[in-house]
């Protein structure tokens, strides 16, 4: 998987960073792209990236503040003008449906593809498909806001070809079934269990993407044992009180969350305009005092997960 940040600024765009949006490339057979938030000018950012609108089949909205949704109507229409008929599903808090339908109705816009809008009212399971189980958890912000947890299925271990050869099991179409851990009957009548020829299964990855939030116990629960957490760090820690009063987090608070959740990796984003690119190393340094494996995202940066 790869995660590309299209916008990493908080609140309003700056000369160096656009407002929030990121795209997860599942790198699967379906070539699916999942977008998280869609701030103003996200589609313009896409023009400068490798992201293809037609491949985006899910959009997850964390909350209804403008810097996270004002890019949606234009993006939906541009996706349609590209001629795609691929279905699109949008998940978001209550109100996202009215926002989208009002924008499309008043502008008399027509979409060439099926659009399904699913409103979220509480924590819990969302769906399981494409080898991923998705769930959400409520955060602490002035408006309803959610974080999303994606848990990848475990993958079968590698097939032990040497053991198969030692036991005189010839290569054939049954290898594919053995790799899946299934039981097969060989041409000579022998029945073998694929699980006996596989190494330990490969644990699936867990990725948690937060919306805006101040520290809250539910965030720790949502991020528990995650391989990667994407979390806002609007201000340096000397402005933690100001951050919290607006429903946001500081650098150190984001790092503390990752540590409490026993996460493996933290990527911070949603940086205030008061910090120039030259100052971002200072934000990262603060995180490193608490959680060493922290990175800071910039626009158009892609992280391998």
Curated annotation (Swiss-Prot):
One of its GO terms (molecular function) is exonuclease activity. Zn(2+) 2 binds at residues 67-68, 212, 270. Signal peptide: none annotated. Its EC number is 3.1.-.-. Binds 2 Zn(2+) ions. Its cofactor is Zn(2+). It holds the Pfam family Lactamase_B. It is an enzyme of class 3 (hydrolase). Keywords: Endonuclease, Exonuclease, Hydrolase, Metal-binding, Nuclease, tRNA processing, Zinc. Zn(2+) 1 binds at residues 63, 65, 141, 212. The active site is at 67 (proton acceptor). Homodimer. PANTHER family: ZINC PHOSPHODIESTERASE ELAC PROTEIN 1. Zinc phosphodiesterase, which has both exoribonuclease and endoribonuclease activities. Belongs to the RNase Z family. RNase BN subfamily. This is Ribonuclease BN. It comes from Proteus mirabilis (strain HI4320).
């Amino acid at each position: 998987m790869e995660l590309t940040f299209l916008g990493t600024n908080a609140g309003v765009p700056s000369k160096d960073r656009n407002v929030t949006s990121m795209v997860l490339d599942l790198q699967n057979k379906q070539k699916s792209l999942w977008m998280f938030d869609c701030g103003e000018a996200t589609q313009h950012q896409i023009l400068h990236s490798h992201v293809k609108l037609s491949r985006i089949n899910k959009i997850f909205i964390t909350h209804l503040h403008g810097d996270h949704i004002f890019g949606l109507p234009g993006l939906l229409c541009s996706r349609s003008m590209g001629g795609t008929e691929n279905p699109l599903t949008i998940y978001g808090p209550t109100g996202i449906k009215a926002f989208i339908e009002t924008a499309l109705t008043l502008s008399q816009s027509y979409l060439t593809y099926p659009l399904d809008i699913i409103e979220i009212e509480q924590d819990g399971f969302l769906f399981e498909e494409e080898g991923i189980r998705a769930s959400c958890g409520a955060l602490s912000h002035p408006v309803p806001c959610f974080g999303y947890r994606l848990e990848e299925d475990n993958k079968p271990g590698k097939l032990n070809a040497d053991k198969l050869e030692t036991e005189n099991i010839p290569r054939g179409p049954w290898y594919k079934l053995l790799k899946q851990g299934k039981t097969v009957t060989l041409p000579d009548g022998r029945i073998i269990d694929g699980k006996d020829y596989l190494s330990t299964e490969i644990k699936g990855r867990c990725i948690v993407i937060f919306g805006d939030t101040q520290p809250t116990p539910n965030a720790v629960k949502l991020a528990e044992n995650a391989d990667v957490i994407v979390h806002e760090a609007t201000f340096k820690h000397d402005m933690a009180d100001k951050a919290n009063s607006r429903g946001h987090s500081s650098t150190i608070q984001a790092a503390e969350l990752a540590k409490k959740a026993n996460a493996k990796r933290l990527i911070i984003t949603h940086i205030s305009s008061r910090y120039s690119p030259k100052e971002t190393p200072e934000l990262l340094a603060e995180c490193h005092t608490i959680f060493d494996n922290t990175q800071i995202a910039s626009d158009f940066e892609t992280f391998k997960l």
